[in-house]
Amino acid sequence: MSPEDSSTASVSRAPVPEGTISVAVGLFVNGISTYIFFKIGQQALGQDGFKPIVTMWFIAFALVPGFFLPIEQETSRALAHRRALGQGGLPIIKRIIPLAAVILGGLLIALALAARSATDNLFETNSAVTLALLFMLLTYAPMHIARGLSSGQGKFSNYALIIGLDGTIRVGV
């Protein structure tokens, strides 16, 4: 590399990759919101009363990333690849949405079949917690698709907004 090439490369380089700051802010907001959610919930319901919600939380965050994070990542990767080639992303979207719907449907059917047992054995007979788990699955599936679409199109501020809203909405609910 000639001296001119190296000086041009160093001048054009940003100190951090595009989107780093906005995603960091979104993650920070989500983290603080999660802490607030647990703090308020435990104070309002007491440690024993909050236990079913904590159980639901851990079940949801074992299922959701396990099933929907790969969809988010593949959506992002495929869209970024097509964007680099100057191609549209509609073919990716047409494949990802039905796939996510089938996975979500399978999870909802499994939860429906296990609802009574889950309510009795995991959520201390609180059926509202079982419904909350169902609601979480219904909302996190499209959220992961939206995150994949945002990051794949290089719209990291939208990605960060989704992450931040995830936490703040949880506190509000």
Which residues are covered by each model-predicted region?
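Short, Lys/Arg-rich, polar N-terminal cytosolic tail immediately upstream
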Residues: M1-P17
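Hydrophobic transmembrane helix module of multi-pass membrane transport proteins
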Residues: S2-E4, A100-V173
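Signature of the first transmembrane helix
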Residues: A14-E72, A112, M136
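Hydrophobic alpha-helix/TM-entry signal in multi-pass membrane transporters
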Residues: P15-V23, W57, I96, V129, ...
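Hydrophobic alpha-helical interface/terminus motif in multipass membrane transporters
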Residues: G41, T75-L79, A118-T119, S150
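A helix-boundary/kink motif common to multi-pass secondary transporters
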Residues: L45-G49, A80, A84, K155
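Membrane-interface alpha-helices at helix entry/exit sites of multi-pass transporters
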Residues: P52, L85-L99
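Helix-loop junctions and terminal segments of transmembrane helices
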Residues: F68-A84, G152
